Amino acid sequence: MKAVHLYEEIEIPQGINVNIEGMKIKVKGPKGEIEKDFSHISGIEIRKEDNKIVVETTFADRRKKAQFYSIIAHIENMFTGVTKGYRYYLKIIYTHFPVTVKVSGNEVQIQNLIGEKNIRRAKIMTGVKVNVKGEDIIVEGQDIEKVGQTAANIELASKITGYDRRVFADGIYIYKKEVIGSEQTD
């Protein structure tokens, strides 16, 4: 069944500037700037009215309804990112061969994973900071998508194939996600 009219107002928090050009949204706040392009989505209107962002569509089927609420979630994540930021925690796990992880330019280098001689590399997305502290890796940034993708890149680069995962648990795993400055964790 189609929803005849979907309308949502998102309050713009204080200290945040929003610029909307067509389906491109640019959000600027105290921690930085995020820009997202929703031009691949048709039939949904995004506009700024006073101190609110209005997202609106008509005759929405299941797909358009999902896109509508996804746009709203992206905008709210952008607001959180430019005011607080996001942080992911990863744990380096090894049993016999000590794994060495270091940040070099725009990549994370993983050495000696299960005794391998080759260096595994994971790409760091732009605008994301990666810190290695002992057996923990901390990934921080404003854009939740880039922070999550960087953490996933590190996790995938350390994935071991050809071994029983129940026996060989060596690798790097995400164990905590949080909004910087809040106690809420996922």
From Swiss-Prot:
Gene Ontology annotations of biological process type: cytoplasmic translation
Example GO molecular function: structural constituent of ribosome
Keywords tagged on the record: Ribonucleoprotein, Ribosomal protein, RNA-binding, rRNA-binding
Job description of the protein: This protein binds to the 23S rRNA, and is important in its secondary structure. It is located near the subunit interface in the base of the L7/L12 stalk, and near the tRNA binding site of the peptidyltransferase center.
NCBIfam families in the record: PRK05518.1, uL6_arch
PANTHER family: 60S RIBOSOMAL PROTEIN L9, 60S/50S RIBOSOMAL PROTEIN L6/L9
Protein name: Large ribosomal subunit protein uL6
Lineage summary: Archaea, Thermoproteota, Thermoprotei, Sulfolobales, Sulfolobaceae
